[in-house]
Curated annotation (Swiss-Prot):
Biological process annotations from GO: peptide transport
Keywords: Periplasm, Signal, Transport
Main location: periplasm
Similarity-based family: Belongs to the bacterial solute-binding protein 5 family.
Species in which this protein is naturally found: Escherichia coli (strain K12)
Its biological purpose: Not part of a putrescine export system. Very similar to a S.typhimurium protein implicated in antimicrobial peptide resistance, but the SapBCDF operon in E.coli is implicated in putrescine export.
Gene it is expressed from: sapA
GO CC, alphabetical: ATP-binding cassette (ABC) transporter complex, substrate-binding subunit-containing; membrane; outer membrane-bounded periplasmic space
The protein's name in its UniProt record: Probable ABC transporter periplasmic-binding protein SapA
GO molecular function, a single term: peptide transmembrane transporter activity
Amino acid sequence: MRQVLSSLLVIAGLVSGQAIAAPESPPHADIRDSGFVYCVSGQVNTFNPSKASSGLIVDTLAAQFYDRLLDVDPYTYRLMPELAESWEVLDNGATYRFHLRRDVPFQKTDWFTPTRKMNADDVVFTFQRIFDRNNPWHNVNGSNFPYFDSLQFADNVKSVRKLDNHTVEFRLAQPDASFLWHLATHYASVMSAEYARKLEKEDRQEQLDRQPVGTGPYQLSEYRAGQFIRLQRHDDFWRGKPLMPQVVVDLGSGGTGRLSKLLTGECDVLAWPAASQLSILRDDPRLRLTLRPGMNVAYLAFNTAKPPLNNPAVRHALALAINNQRLMQSIYYGTAETAASILPRASWAYDNEAKITEYNPAKSREQLKSLGLENLTLKLWVPTRSQAWNPSPLKTAELIQADMAQVGVKVVIVPVEGRFQEARLMDMSHDLTLSGWATDSNDPDSFFRPLLSCAAIHSQTNLAHWCDPKFDSVLRKALSSQQLAARIEAYDEAQSILAQELPILPLASSLRLQAYRYDIKGLVLSPFGNASFAGVYREKQDEVKKP
């Protein structure tokens, strides 16, 4: 426990202050002439997405700083080439060979000047750091790689090796049909091995996760904690020069403050507006609104390691008390679907017969009484910031608190702030946790294993602390086949186990929302996370009629 907490605090401390030396400058100075302002709620604990479980680096920044071997088409949900031009699946899914794109330059920054283009050394370095526990880089800034740890990545990847300068091969201990999809997530962003070697010589390895260097369309120019992040155009970006010279990511306001900035023009783009703000956004002719299905789920996690919540009957009784339809109306305002599974309805493995629970407070009260739990008090831990899957976590908690009171259960709401949330959850004092998950993968495994596998307890993404060897076995069966029908059958079984055991109660799968000023063009809103800003531009005033 001490080691886990220490690792979390080390990572949190990486960017707690100013990330790079920069002169004091107003974040929005002359931005309309050379870029745009992207307003978002969040904070930065690391600039390396593989070291994060979620947050701003994964949702927004990774697509600007870095590239991955593969991408996911935001419209067809198919895998696409990115740094890998092509790939081969060998040995029934136990070997994956990637043929890399040539002439992909890394960013030239104030802290690093590359002397070569991206090659196989960079891919090997990136993934050896993650899976090889003996690699000298594995423990830099803590040994945790939350997403990959939850997948037991280090246990299944036997090797990643360079076949030549532009060919890389991964060998797995067991076939894994989801492997390509995990490499298409932002957690699998490719780092510069040359930059890492430079930092090694200077004995400054920790800077790799603090001062990023990637191949993406924008690079870090300035960072002021809790205020803003300034991104500068990567002029040599391999897809072509991004259209905007700079982007300011504004971190300085909460929900209503960000809306005010959008209305006054201080913000050009508002990420994840609250559903309650939709009528304002729709009625203002100066604004545009984009809605897309989201690969996400909001859920209530029961701490199954703590009595009486270790009893599935208790979890089912409590679930009956929650009025999910009221959550849809009061929190999401029609921008979400009631979740009947951990998987969103857009997933190819979603079970159309799935039904986890119902709203029946009388039955809940009766079952709790029969279990001898008539005066139960529970602590509900809640993040304070809006999330992609839940625009108003605290209000959601208050509604759940009121529902529980109707069946005689007292719920004490404990707001949990920012970077210490995971560390505090590991001390096991909570009973319930309001959380969620969003993925940039269309593979069901990106929901099941990170949230509910036994390994995910140690990676701090399994907030229910639930471990079922039978469930893990079903997930392994799903990964062992390249046949879609066999995988769907296994995931149906997994969803059936979850409906019986109920370690978490899925609440909603929400739409992804984005509001922006009328003159901003080229934004792409993906179901899987934020897309690159490379194609964003501001239409000139003489070319657009102002509303």
